[in-house]
């Protein structure tokens, strides 16, 4: 059978620039999602090092948490306040372990 032609009433007409923006938004969504996942992974790694009471690894992981969260803000993935909350929680956990 021949392929079915789309019904013109159901097709949304878009300008080429709008089509490009849709594709670009989809690409950015994938990139942003993977970066958010990376942040979550690093935070979990930091929390795991806290449970092991490994001071050197904890401080190293704290620096990586700070770094990756700041990069997320720079890229526009996180807002400033969300980054501040994540960093504050991490620092509070380290200080609670130290005392």
UniProtKB/Swiss-Prot annotation:
Gene Ontology biological process terms from the UniProt entry: translation
User: Family per UniProt?
Assistant: Belongs to the bacterial ribosomal protein bS20 family.
PANTHER family in alphabetical order: 30S RIBOSOMAL PROTEIN S20 (PTHR33398), SMALL RIBOSOMAL SUBUNIT PROTEIN BS20C (PTHR33398:SF1)
State if rRNA-binding is listed as a keyword: yes
Q: Which InterPro entries does the entry link to? A: Ribosomal_bS20 (IPR002583), Ribosomal_bS20_sf (IPR036510)
Q: Pfam families attached here?
A: Ribosomal_S20p
Q: Name one GO cellular component term.
A: cytosol
List the source organism. Chlamydia pneumoniae
- Which cysteines pair up through disulfides? They are none
Name of the gene encoding the protein in the UniProt record: rpsT
Protein purpose: Binds directly to 16S ribosomal RNA.
Identify the HAMAP family for this entry.
Ribosomal_bS20 (MF_00500)
Top-rank lineage group of the source organism: Bacteria
Per its record, how is this protein called by name? Answer: Small ribosomal subunit protein bS20
**Per UniProt, which keywords does this protein have?**
Ribonucleoprotein, Ribosomal protein, RNA-binding, rRNA-binding
One molecular function GO term is: small ribosomal subunit rRNA binding
